[in-house]
């Protein structure tokens, strides 16, 4: 018996049988060992072959295991285990069977045919569980497809379609695919291309997330429902799994062997199968080693001859990058462009998917949530595409509510923690014997019993709410199951069963569900508070958007409305004087938050003009602090760094071919990460004039294209440019009316900036020079900051009025604005106070009183 003539699979089974015999202390390898080893192989080909021949595989496996337990055992042999006489005879019979069929190698299924002729236990068991010679031979012929076994790996390449593809039509039949709404034109165009005589291979090209794969799933559903032309009826749509094809292909030629087996089976199928290759570009170069062919080249002949009916899908970028380079492959495909659906189409798609997501999460998705998901994702998530980004919002919001349902409500959690705290205290007080402790114990007992009653009431409400939600969820699941059953019955032509379900059971369950929801609503109205949410509304969608982008999308709370109405007062806490500037900025923010501003432009764009140190930069910081409660969302760009022409590339990123192309631009990358921010372009007149050309698009359309060709959204930013232009004029005309000063300054601005740049700015704001009264107020703000630093050391700072007046006097300089005041505070207060602290004159808990007398500042401690 030549074991080298066995196929690899058969050799593996023999080795497994030997191992099995050794493990069970059997002296010989019996036919039962080998048959069980064949049935336990990973790919399960022998098991599926037996099932195809009408054999009950599972009971047969159990019977074989049982028969092995009855075999005699010999302990302590330790030597080589040989083949028994029965098995040797069977293997010879197997060789004969293979020769009859003209095979060059002996395959596993030949052993099954030989085993049927066996007079021993194996043959008896096979016959007992339904094996017949005719059925087994028929099963072998259908698996082989008329092929002879010509190499040792022949078994591995069988049923390649089953191993390396996923049947989409079967998934559609069992209701596992999501419904495909709309996309009729694209599906019709795909069907049209599939019906061509040559080049009948459509490739769906579109941005990621627009629904290319969904179109193929829609085609599979139409084929199952019979809503396709006669030529496509009863065809299968198989999705090729490239990962499975490549996985485990260790040796040269193994991948090609697998792909060849797939193509061979498709050719034998005679056009009854449509192959879907998702991410088509992965075929170009897949499996390519030195001197070997890649998958793309292997597909070309099959595509050209029309043996392979193929639908591809890939993105625009990858199609251009990989497929277009291979002109011979590209010409075999017909392009079908898939555009991003609009907001209305997305709403229709979401309504179609609504039931599936409700069923999965066990929550109710309201119609306002669907509309909000489409509109908010379109407006605020600009770097992705509809409908994918809208579906993500619905999914995440529903998942969040589901998570809330599965965890303990916040109000109960707080009660629980409070009860634990009180019980710990009660145990501690119990050990004390004095009267005060006894009184405290009585109070604690009363408090604990009160909280326990409250907790028990809430627990009852929670249980009732959960049971209502569970009841409606069970009805929904049953409804979904019956609808799938009704569709299957209609397809089979079992109209009696379909009508029973459609006009009997389904309406009955729908009425039951409506009644349950009605009861739930009336129960919710009667019981307050409601402990957990069961609905996804527009507010929940807005929360998800806000969390993902940092943009406040949710409805304004009363507190925020008041905050916006009194915005000027809040900004004036940090910016002294400059009433006109503060008012203009506040108006722009109120316009945008109330929803009246143009959604395609930034919230506001301003040019702040004025002398140094009058509060231009400070107003930007105050604005960032007001909008985001921190200055982290202030993107500050010092335009003096962009004095050369080539420095524009630093703002938007280097173009292709230049060093730093992958890094992105300084401004564009920050805005992509923080789309809701205040952008401060400081000292704008110091930048090269070409920088302003880049800003034109931002100011007009609220977008900028970076060095990598990505569009960055500036629609949720406030853009502020500061400049010292006309500052001398402002100093000279400080006593004049604001409008007069503005007109004079604008004359100088127009000589420096181009008209198209000035024309795109919302407001040019002129900051006037500061007076002595303003400086005194600024001194108070700066001293309060010093007070905060001292408060960390547990000290208080009190500055007398004369000392404050002196500081304002020393720090006042009409040319330099408020900046000299900082230096004055450092020189007059911080420096001497630092010495006093180091000498130990003040300690924690002291109040430091600062007074001015005899020409200098004096510090005294008040304890």
Curated annotation (Swiss-Prot):
Clp R domain segment(s): 3-146
Residue ranges of the region described as Linker: 341-550
Ranges for region NBD2: 560-769
PANTHER family, alphabetized: ATP-DEPENDENT CLP PROTEASE, HEAT SHOCK PROTEIN 104
Natural source organism: Nitrosomonas europaea (strain ATCC 19718 / CIP 103999 / KCTC 2705 / NBRC 14298)
Location of the region described as Repeat 1 in the Swiss-Prot/TrEMBL record: 6-71
Recorded GO MF terms: ATP binding; ATP hydrolysis activity
Self-association state and partner proteins as the record states: Homohexamer. The oligomerization is ATP-dependent.
Protein name as it appears in the record: Chaperone protein ClpB
UniProt-listed Pfam families: AAA, AAA_2, AAA_lid_9, Clp_N, ClpB_D2-small
Encoding gene, per UniProt annotation: clpB
InterPro entries attached to this UniProt entry: AAA+_ATPase, ATPase_AAA_core, Chaperonin_ClpB, Clp_ATPase_C, Clp_N_dom_sf, Clp_R_dom, ClpA/B, ClpA/B_CS1
Function recorded in the entry: Part of a stress-induced multi-chaperone system, it is involved in the recovery of the cell from heat-induced damage, in cooperation with DnaK, DnaJ and GrpE. Acts before DnaK, in the processing of protein aggregates. Protein binding stimulates the ATPase activity; ATP hydrolysis unfolds the denatured protein aggregates, which probably helps expose new hydrophobic binding sites on the surface of ClpB-bound aggregates, contributing to the solubilization and refolding of denatured protein aggregates by DnaK.
Region (NBD1): 159-340
NCBIfam families given in the database record: chaperone_ClpB (TIGR03346)
Keywords: ATP-binding, Chaperone, Coiled coil, Cytoplasm, Nucleotide-binding, Repeat, Stress response
Assigned protein family: Belongs to the ClpA/ClpB family.
């Amino acid at each position: 018996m030549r074991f080298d003539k066995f196929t690899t699979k058969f050799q593996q089974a023999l080795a497994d049988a030997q191992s099995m015999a050794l493990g069970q202390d059997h002296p010989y390898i019996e036919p039962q060992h080998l048959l069980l080893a064949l049935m336990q192989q990973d790919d399960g080909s022998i098991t599926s072959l037996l099932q195809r021949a009408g054999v009950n595989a599972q009971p047969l496996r159990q019977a074989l295991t049982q028969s092995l337990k009855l075999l005699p055992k010999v302990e302590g042999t330790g030597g080589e285990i040989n083949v028994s006489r029965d098995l040797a005879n069977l293997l010879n019979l197997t060789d004969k069977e293979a020769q009859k069929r003209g095979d060059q190698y002996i395959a596993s299924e030949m052993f099954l045919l030989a085993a049927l002729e066996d007079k021993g236990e194996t043959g008896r068991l096979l016959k007992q569980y339904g094996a017949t010679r005719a059925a087994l031979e028929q099963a072998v012929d259908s698996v082989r497809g008329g092929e002879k076994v010509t190499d040792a790996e022949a078994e591995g390449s069988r049923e390649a379609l089953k191993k390396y593809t996923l049947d989409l039509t079967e998934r559609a039949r069992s209701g596992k695919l999501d419904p495909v709404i709309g996309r009729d034109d694209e599906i019709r165009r795909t069907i049209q291309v599939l019906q061509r005589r040559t080049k009948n291979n459509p490739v769906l090209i579109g941005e990621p997330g627009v629904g290319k794969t969904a179109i193929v799933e829609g085609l599979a559903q139409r084929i199952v429902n019979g809503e396709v032309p006669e030529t496509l009826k009863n065809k299968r749509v198989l999705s090729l799994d490239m990962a499975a094809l490549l996985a485990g292909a260790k040796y040269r030629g193994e991948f090609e062997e697998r792909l060849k087996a797939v193509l061979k089976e498709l050719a034998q199928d005679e056009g009854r199968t449509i192959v879907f290759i998702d991410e088509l570009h992965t075929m170009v170069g897949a499996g390519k080693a030195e001197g070997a062919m890649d998958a793309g080249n292997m597909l070309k002949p099959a595509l050209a001859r029309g043996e392979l009916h193929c639908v591809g899908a890939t993105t625009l970028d990858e199609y251009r990058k990989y497929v277009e380079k291979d002109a011979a492959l590209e010409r075999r495909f017909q392009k079908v462009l898939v555009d991003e659906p609009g907001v209305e189409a997305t709403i229709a798609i979401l309504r179609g998917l609504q039931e599936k997501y409700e069923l999965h999460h066990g929550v109710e998705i309201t119609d306002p949530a669907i509309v909000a998901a489409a509109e908010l994702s379109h407006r605020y998530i600009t770097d992705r595409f509809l409908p994918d980004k809208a579906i993500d919002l619905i999914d995440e919001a529903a998942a969040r509510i589901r998570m809330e349902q599965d965890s303990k409500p916040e109000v109960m959690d707080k009660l629980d923690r409070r009860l634990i705290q009180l019980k710990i205290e009660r145990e501690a007080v119990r050990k004390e014997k004095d009267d005060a402790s006894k009184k405290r114990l009585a109070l604690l007992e009363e408090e604990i019993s009160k909280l326990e009653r409250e907790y028990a009431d809430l627990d009852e409400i929670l249980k009732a709410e959960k049971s209502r939600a569970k009841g409606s969820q069970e009805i929904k699941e049953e409804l979904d199951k019956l609808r799938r059953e009704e569709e299957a019955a209609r397809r089979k032509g079992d109209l009696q069963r379909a009508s029973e379900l459609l006009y009997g059971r389904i309406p009955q369950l729908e009425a039951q569900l409506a009644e349950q929801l009605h009861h739930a609503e009336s129960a919710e109205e009667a019981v307050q508070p409601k402990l957990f949410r069961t609905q996804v509304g527009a507010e929940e969608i807005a929360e998800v958007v806000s969390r993902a982008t940092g943009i406040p999308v949710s409805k304004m709370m009363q507190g925020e409305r008041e905050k916006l109405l009194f915005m000027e007062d809040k900004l004036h806490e940090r910016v002294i004087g400059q009433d006109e500037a503060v008012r203009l900025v506040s108006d722009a923010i109120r316009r945008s938050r109330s929803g009246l501003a143009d959604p395609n432009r930034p919230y506001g764009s301003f040019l702040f003009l004025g002398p140094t140190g009058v509060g231009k930069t400070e107003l930007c910081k105050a604005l960032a602090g007001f909008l985001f409660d921190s200055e982290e969302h202030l993107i500050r760009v010092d335009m003096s760094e962009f004095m050369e022409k080539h420095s524009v590339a630093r703002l938007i990123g280097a173009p292709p071919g230049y060093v730093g192309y992958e890094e992105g631009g300084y401004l564009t990358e920050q805005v992509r990460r923080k789309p809701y921010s205040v952008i401060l372009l400081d000292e704008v007149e110091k930048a090269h004039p070409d920088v302003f050309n880049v800003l034109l698009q931002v100011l007009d359309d609220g977008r900028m294209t970076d060095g990598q060709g990505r569009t960055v959204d500036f629609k949720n930013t406030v853009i502020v440019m500061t400049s010292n232009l006309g500052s001398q004029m402002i100093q000279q005309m400080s006593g004049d009316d604001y409008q007069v000063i503005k007109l004079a300054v604008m004359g100088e601005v127009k000589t420096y900036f181009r008209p198209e740049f000035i024309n795109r700015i919302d407001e040019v704001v002129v900051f006037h020079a500061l007076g002595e009264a303003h400086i005194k107020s600024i001194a108070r703000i700066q001293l309060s900051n010093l007070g905060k630093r001292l408060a960390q050391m547990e000290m208080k700072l009190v500055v007398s009025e004369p000392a404050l007046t002196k500081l304002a006097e020393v720090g006042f300089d009409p040319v330099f604005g408020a900046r000299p005041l900082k230096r004055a505070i450092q020189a007059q207060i911080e420096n001497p106070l630092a010495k006093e602290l180091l000498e130990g004159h003040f300690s924690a808990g002291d109040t430091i009183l600062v007074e001015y007398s005899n020409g200098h500042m004096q510090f005294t401690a008040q304890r």
